[in-house]
Amino acid sequence: MENRMNELVSLLNQYAKEYYTQDNPTVSDSQYDQLYRELVELEKQHPENILPNSPTHRVGGLVLEGFEKYQHEYPLYSLQDAFSKEELIAFDKRVKAEFPTAAYMAELKIDGLSVSLTYVNGVLQVGATRGDGNIGENITENLKRVHDIPLHLDQSLDITVRGECYLPKESFEAINIEKRANGEQEFANPRNAAAGTLRQLNTGIVAKRKLATFLYQEASPTQKETQDDVLKELESYGFSVNHHRLISSSMEKIWDFIQTIEKDRVSLPYDIDGIVIKVNSIAMQEELGFTVKAPRWAIAYKFPAEEKEAEILSVDWTVGRTGVVTPTANLTPVQLAGTTVSRATLHNVDYIAEKDIRIGDTVVVYKAGDIIPAVLNVVMSKRNQQEVMLIPKLCPSCGSELVHFEGEVALRCINPLCPNQIKERLAHFASRDAMNITGFGPSLVEKLFDAHLIADVADIYRLSIENLLTLDGIKEKSATKIYHAIQSSKENSAEKLLFGLGIRHVGSKASRLLLEEFGNLRQLSQASQESIASIDGLGGVIAKSLHTFFEKEEVDKLLEELTSYNVNFNYLGKRVSTDAQLSGLTVVLTGKLEKMTRNEAKEKLQNLGAKVTGSVSKKTDLIVAGSDAGSKLTKAQDLGITIQDEDWLLNL
């Protein structure tokens, strides 16, 4: 029986791959179903012999309580965007200045959700969303229901891979046909449908919706020399990879590829929103490194957005948390990039003046980056004596006089007690990338502020369940959940708190770099501008902004209050002393280790202050070589790099 179960699992997984990944089934649906039912019966009779990669694991049936947070071992960076050929040429010049012979890999930018898959001994252990790049959500059970994600690799590997989970156009249409028939609201586009599906608590629905993936990266250190090699290796492991790609050192040829794909994209069975261009050499990628936000060795070209004409009916002016007043046009509704658009940003007063935008104008509307609706220009041929738009002189929230600083494009309200600014700051503090207080969204902030229960972020930690129960629509269960979420946020690592304070120019990545360096929010608040500016990836603008913020008396009082409520000020990630034994050294692991795993060796090196990379280059300081080290050892010897063995590492 065990042999038959093994045979059925192997056959069914192969047939599923042919159907879902290769679009080339070799058996009929009825034949597949017959074999599947046979396996189900055998597994009922012999549960002790169920294999971890059995296709029956994909059927669903679980109802999850929620999704736990997941700390990514390897951060998921954003990509720098490009919207023109000129920006790609500038990227090429930056790369070629360091590596004149660099070649690029151009790949399709799939319009889906980024996911990370971690395998231990070849078995899928964790599937997670991107989140903020450092912390995502554990959606393993849902990703197990995606038919082209292997549950078990043929090799006993420890590996973390990255890819895009998407909904094919055919599956999207089928879902919306069913929703229409049931009188339910349809999904606006395949990306929204994929996102909604991956956040389902009922895994049976996930299994039914036929999501798919394309893998594009090994996040864990790779022995491969090029991105092309990585993609071939991923495919050999059983992952789906996209075959629409091009390798070339010529940006002109890359541009021709982009033009061809853009022309043909509508015929693809899935949505794409651009082309990702990466330096093909892994060694060159390592040397080019990263900025605070993105790799220096990659860029994402975004296709020009779809454009539609609409009439401006009116304009709303709103105040953000930094006091910037933003105009938003109310439009006659139009369908744009799969969604109904009735509002679009006008950016700022200088933009309105430059484009001569007036109420009643017919304007061209597009989605910037396929996300944010914006007004591109006025269709002057359709203008009929519209009056020049009145620019507000007073803040729409507090009535204070607005200012237009020299050199800035935005109007600002500089009243620190402006109600809208306070509410926006409070909502930002509680947001996912900041203190991540579940249930503490803008609508709750509005209710609490209007009830005079909160006026600054410290007030959040004064709230009781009884306070929350005084608000309309808040019952005991939700009040208790919100209260516990507030208490739980006190234990966040301090970079979340720093970002939540909303300091100008200090984003989430900069917050993490700052706390990695200083370890404690108090120490950061007392640091000199020079010491902050010297941190790689930051600089003078951020240093000055922090210095200006922390020297305010009210900020010092706020920090004292947060301390009194036991809000954590310490960085909880790994910090390495600058006088650690290998501090500042770049180290490469190669060959087979006998007494420790590669991950154990990597962790030990990092704890000793080393930066562990996957490729040998002139920037490598040290190589730790096991048996069968191969070409990396040879290259290290040619470059005169110090070479140590496993015993040396064990004795450190």
From Swiss-Prot:
<dbReference type="InterPro" id="IPR036420">
    <property type="entry name" value="BRCT_dom_sf"/>
</dbReference>
<keyword id="KW-0862">Zinc</keyword>
<dbReference type="Pfam" id="PF14520">
    <property type="entry name" value="HHH_5"/>
</dbReference>
<feature type="binding site">
    <location>
        <position position="395"/>
    </location>
    <ligand>
        <name>Zn(2+)</name>
    </ligand>
</feature>
<feature type="binding site">
    <location>
        <position position="398"/>
    </location>
    <ligand>
        <name>Zn(2+)</name>
    </ligand>
</feature>
<dbReference type="Pfam" id="PF03120">
    <property type="entry name" value="DNA_ligase_OB"/>
</dbReference>
<dbReference type="GO" id="GO:0003677">
    <property type="term" value="F:DNA binding"/>
</dbReference>
<dbReference type="Pfam" id="PF03119">
    <property type="entry name" value="DNA_ligase_ZBD"/>
</dbReference>
<keyword id="KW-0436">Ligase</keyword>
<feature type="binding site">
    <location>
        <position position="413"/>
    </location>
    <ligand>
        <name>Zn(2+)</name>
    </ligand>
</feature>
<dbReference type="InterPro" id="IPR004150">
    <property type="entry name" value="NAD_DNA_ligase_OB"/>
</dbReference>
<feature type="binding site">
    <location>
        <position position="302"/>
    </location>
    <ligand>
        <name>NAD(+)</name>
    </ligand>
</feature>
<dbReference type="InterPro" id="IPR004149">
    <property type="entry name" value="Znf_DNAligase_C4"/>
</dbReference>
<dbReference type="InterPro" id="IPR013839">
    <property type="entry name" value="DNAligase_adenylation"/>
</dbReference>
<dbReference type="Pfam" id="PF12826">
    <property type="entry name" value="HHH_2"/>
</dbReference>
<feature type="domain" description="BRCT">
    <location>
        <begin position="577"/>
        <end position="652"/>
    </location>
</feature>
<feature type="binding site">
    <location>
        <position position="418"/>
    </location>
    <ligand>
        <name>Zn(2+)</name>
    </ligand>
</feature>
<dbReference type="InterPro" id="IPR001357">
    <property type="entry name" value="BRCT_dom"/>
</dbReference>
<keyword id="KW-0227">DNA damage</keyword>
<feature type="binding site">
    <location>
        <position position="278"/>
    </location>
    <ligand>
        <name>NAD(+)</name>
    </ligand>
</feature>
<keyword id="KW-0460">Magnesium</keyword>
<dbReference type="Pfam" id="PF01653">
    <property type="entry name" value="DNA_ligase_aden"/>
</dbReference>
<keyword id="KW-0479">Metal-binding</keyword>
<keyword id="KW-0464">Manganese</keyword>
<feature type="binding site">
    <location>
        <begin position="29"/>
        <end position="33"/>
    </location>
    <ligand>
        <name>NAD(+)</name>
    </ligand>
</feature>
<feature type="binding site">
    <location>
        <position position="130"/>
    </location>
    <ligand>
        <name>NAD(+)</name>
    </ligand>
</feature>
<dbReference type="GO" id="GO:0006281">
    <property type="term" value="P:DNA repair"/>
</dbReference>
<keyword id="KW-0234">DNA repair</keyword>
<dbReference type="GO" id="GO:0046872">
    <property type="term" value="F:metal ion binding"/>
</dbReference>
<dbReference type="Pfam" id="PF00533">
    <property type="entry name" value="BRCT"/>
</dbReference>
<dbReference type="InterPro" id="IPR012340">
    <property type="entry name" value="NA-bd_OB-fold"/>
</dbReference>
<dbReference type="GO" id="GO:0005829">
    <property type="term" value="C:cytosol"/>
</dbReference>
<dbReference type="InterPro" id="IPR041663">
    <property type="entry name" value="DisA/LigA_HHH"/>
</dbReference>
<feature type="binding site">
    <location>
        <position position="107"/>
    </location>
    <ligand>
        <name>NAD(+)</name>
    </ligand>
</feature>
<dbReference type="InterPro" id="IPR010994">
    <property type="entry name" value="RuvA_2-like"/>
</dbReference>
<dbReference type="Pfam" id="PF22745">
    <property type="entry name" value="Nlig-Ia"/>
</dbReference>
<comment type="similarity">
    <text>Belongs to the NAD-dependent DNA ligase family. LigA subfamily.</text>
</comment>
<feature type="binding site">
    <location>
        <position position="164"/>
    </location>
    <ligand>
        <name>NAD(+)</name>
    </ligand>
</feature>
<feature type="active site" description="N6-AMP-lysine intermediate">
    <location>
        <position position="109"/>
    </location>
</feature>
<dbReference type="InterPro" id="IPR018239">
    <property type="entry name" value="DNA_ligase_AS"/>
</dbReference>
<keyword id="KW-0235">DNA replication</keyword>
<dbReference type="InterPro" id="IPR001679">
    <property type="entry name" value="DNA_ligase"/>
</dbReference>
